[in-house]
Amino acid sequence: MSLGNIPQAVGEPDGDEHPLSNPWCTAATKPVPQKISRFASPESMLAPMGDSPAVPITIRNTWKAVVDHARRYQDFTYVYPVISRRSRGLSIGVNLNPDTQCNFDCVYCEVDRTTPGKARDVRLDQVRDELRWLIDHALSGGLGLEAKFNDAPPEVSRIVRDVAFSGDGEPTMVSNFDECVEVVANVLREKGLSETKIVLITDSAGLDKVSVRRGVSLMDAHHGEVWAKLDAGTEEYYRHINRSSVRFDRILSNLLETARVRPIVIQSLFLKTHGQPMSSIELEAYCGRLNQIRDGGGTLREVHAYTLARPTPEAWATRLSAEELSAVAETIRAQTGLRVEEFP
């Protein structure tokens, strides 16, 4: 697995701020820039880890690894690093769908689905090896020296905030999701990161599958979190935005049943279509769905309200301003009483 040549420059960060706390891992002293052989192991770069920073780090919208969430890293197939505002730092993604298989075709998704991908089985040994290597590379300080990450403080890319099943499609579509979770949990334990979260970012369509239920139960034992999509309040708007053949009532049922077992996070993208934001009637219906989940015995940890951050395949799908997103979030708070985090 290759490292390539690591750039040495460190830029000045700027942009919106989000707090980064460090409850588990320790930060490092600034590593000495160096060029790494293509065949070097990250263990050869291990540097001593220092105390956690006393002042919280901020995640800035303009950092390259925040702007660019490409699911391709080096010559890997499954594993990739990003700096995530929602994770508040380094998130290691596990892309179980390099074939781009998905049961949604959201108007805002940047994944190219004009040429359908070819389904293939997930190679668990390769997931394990890629994840081991990338964790070592991050903890050693090597990741922070790469061009995509060198405009952020070094400690940001040395603290693994979570490992997230997320990528070019829907993670729950694979047949062995539970085995994938087991691989990730074992690697985290092996690397001394047993307290690090395992996150499933999902459109919720597959949460009723037996292997997925087993996998999510295993996540529960390893500080797992389910971040589940809900972008609509009505079937009509759901079809318009998510463009899926999966019935909307199945999505709602899966959300409810999953939230009855453990608290879940709702992730909702709000946007304009043909210049118009979600109508007040649709937003009220959306809030009603959240209340139905809670009234039905489900627990919602919080809502992540966000808008477009990257180019979309549909020119008529455009982002909300920060003020418009805040107004949406305030309506959700008022109508549901839930905690809502905004990511403009």
Predicted regions and their residues:
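A short small-residue
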Residues: Y108-T115, D162-F165, I264-L269, T307-A309
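Conserved Radical SAM active-site core
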Residues: V111-H222
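N-terminal [4Fe-4S]-dependent radical SAM core
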Residues: L46-D99, D105-V107, R113-D121, Q126-D129, ...
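Short aromatic/hydrophobic contact patches that present stacked aromatics
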Residues: S91-N95, A164, V199, W227
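Auxiliary Fe-S-binding modules of radical SAM enzymes
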Residues: M1-S2, P7, G11, H18-C25, ...
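Conserved AdoMet/S-adenosylmethionine-binding subsite of the radical SAM
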Residues: M173-T318
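Short, conserved loop/turn and helix-capping segments at secondary-structure boundaries
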Residues: D121, D125, S245, R319-S326
